Amino acid sequence: VSLGFWHNFGDTGVYENMRQMCFTAFDHGITHFDLANNYGPQPGSAEENLGKILREELSSYRDELIISSKAGFDMWSGPYGNWGSRKYLIASLDQSLKRMGLDYVDIFYHHRPDPNTPLEETVRALDGIVKSGKALYVGISNYNKEQTIAAAAVSYTHLTLPTTPY
């Protein structure tokens, strides 16, 4: 079970409500907080708000928390502000880490398949993110069965890190 930050933790929400939701979840044993770079509303604001909560009150519990984030949707204009290129995924994660005030996330997901970037580039970028220490684990989100099988095949063929199929 995780607490999702999609539309509940953006700039349009009341900060005290966000804080209370986090603490209620944590006090009831929910330690997985799930975010994405574009969660808000205002893209990135959910990560900023969690970062504030972490800094002010939950930093001593970081080792008990699983923080996940995702990238794959629009974040900035231009050819590298969206989808699944290596440049976009790494830049997005770097910005997410900065917003949350973290050195790493526990899980980083590619949020949706990219029809224009070779799957091998996306999967290798995820592998590189783990190797860099910016994420402990990586995964995919919103991939259908065939896309998941293809991504797994690429990972088994091209990655240097072992993969776990869950």
Annotate each predicted stretch with a short phrase:
Residues 1-65, 131:
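N-terminal binding-site loop/beta-alpha segment at the start of enzyme catalytic domains
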Residues 3, 33, 50, 67, ...:
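Conserved, mostly hydrophobic/aromatic
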Residues 6, 36-38, 70-74, 110-113, ...:
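Active-site beta-loop-alpha junctions enriched in small/polar residues
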Residues 14-25, 85-98:
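Short, acidic/polar
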Residues 45-56, 117-125, 144-156:
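Distinct, well-ordered alpha-helical segments
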Residues 100-115:
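Active-site groove signature of glycoside hydrolases
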Residues 157-163:
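Conserved small/polar residues in nucleotide/adenosyl-binding loops
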